[in-house]
Amino acid sequence: MATKIACFGEVLFDVFPTHRKIGGAPLNVGLRMASLGIETQIISRIGEDEIGTELLDFVTQNGVRIDSIQSDKNFATGEVVVKLDDKGSASYTINYPVAWDKIEATPEAQSVVANSDALVFGS
């Protein structure tokens, strides 16, 4: 039987001065696991917005299942503004409130966790 990984938590865009990059610690782990051929699913929440759609497309194209990414009409997909100092050290400004703070423990999400071999969460 194949290993199954569930990742729970934030999905977002890191916004740098010159570009944006999809991120969020649980999603980063999920993307890496999927690149190794491990069946991976992310449990999170995005806004019903353009960047949420972009995020879903990217995650799907990279082999992570999105069945448990919830959609929110009231809160936006997460964005974190990243500033680098002269030495390259980063500081972060998280725009609140965002959809990932509203992830619900739906029966579907609970089933994903129950049927996985491991749960990844946190930053």
Give each language-model segment a name.
Residues 1-65:
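Glycine-rich phosphate/adenosyl-contacting loop at the front of the ribokinase-like
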Residues 9-11, 118-123:
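Short beta-strands and strand-loop turn motifs
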Residues 39, 43-121:
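Conserved N-terminal subdomain of the carbohydrate kinase-like
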